[in-house]
UniProtKB/Swiss-Prot annotation:
Intracellular or extracellular location(s): Cytoplasm
Principal place of residence: cytoplasm
Recorded superkingdom: Bacteria
Keywords linked to the UniProt accession: Cytoplasm, Ribosome biogenesis
Signal peptide: none
Protein name: Ribosome maturation factor RimP
GO cellular component: cytosol
Family as reported in the entry's similarity comment: Belongs to the RimP family.
Function (record text): Required for maturation of 30S ribosomal subunits.
Any single biological process term in GO: translation
């Protein structure tokens, strides 16, 4: 069974792509107050503006209202993935190939969890 975040991803991703955005990540916090957090990036490399976030938020809100996945009231937060974004999809690694990254591991590797360069 899919989580709420996965279900939301499935129903909004195509619409965001059509709008020119990559859906980077969806998080759902199911405790009161419930929060749907959506991180986006531009497919064409442009910076994400507040207007972009507003338009995406309106689109997602309309879709979620129709699909009725979340019982009770919730807050919807849409933002840019930012410069320190987490790479969560395989395609992201190719997109940022050749750029400097800081890698933070969950487990020790050679006695370290942080590799700044």
């Amino acid at each position: 069974m899919q989580t709420i975040a996965q279900q939301i991803t499935n129903i909004i991703e195509e619409s965001l792509t059509d709008m020119g955005f990559e859906l980077v990540l969806v998080k759902f916090k199911g405790v009161s107050p419930k929060v749907v957090e959506v991180l986006i990036d531009s497919l064409n490399g442009n910076k994400i503006s507040i207007e972009d976030c507003t338009n995406v938020s309106r689109t997602i809100s309309a879709i979620l209202d129709v699909e009725d996945l979340i019982e009770e009231a919730y807050s919807l937060e849409v933002s840019s993935s930012g410069i320190e974004r987490t790479l969560v999809k395989f395609e992201n690694y190719n997109r940022f190939l050749g750029r400097e990254v800081k890698i933070k591991l969950k487990e020790l590797l050679n006695g370290k969890t942080l590799y700044p360069r």
